[in-house]
């Protein structure tokens, strides 16, 4: 019986999705590297890297890479090679605002930005979730080769957004594409 309990505990521990992080994180399959903050937790999916310190509903940083031929979840629209950064920003904002869980969506800022030395965009927006929690996001995005890269920080407007903004800025500043055309 003890042996089965030990095996069960090992299996459960092996399935734990959140991993404590800190330092350089490199994803060769996703073609990027980034410095992750000490003490935060990481969760990977096939297209995304999530990190949080206090829980994804309070604050999270998301780094995603999507193939441009993949339809966006809420609008079913696709990116195209050669799109201008502002066109990419408009497509992304349209997709986010079409999410039924995003309420009272408001764009605060939408400007050009450089990301890992390449032209991209920066958008800042607020919204409420279905529970009425007011959230603020800062999203940088660009298309390189056949992929869209997005680096997004989302946090509760009250306390968390301002509290962890410098951490996000450090993460964003360390983001590097491993290979570019």
What kind of feature is each model-predicted range?
Residues 40, 147-181:
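Surface-exposed amphipathic alpha-helical segments
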Residues 12-30:
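Bacterial Sec signal peptide processing site at the extreme N-terminus
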Residues 43, 95-99, 126, 171-174, ...:
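Structured segments of extracytoplasmic/periplasmic soluble domains
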Residues 38-40, 55, 125-129, 139, ...:
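A mature extracytoplasmic/lumenal domain signature
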Residues 30-90:
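Secretory pathway targeting signatures of secreted, lumenal, and periplasmic proteins
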Residues 86-142:
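Signature of long, low-cysteine stretches enriched in small and polar/charged residues
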Residues 55-57, 116, 142-148:
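Short, solvent-exposed coil/turn segments at beta-strand boundaries
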Residues 4-13:
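Sec-dependent N-terminal signal peptides
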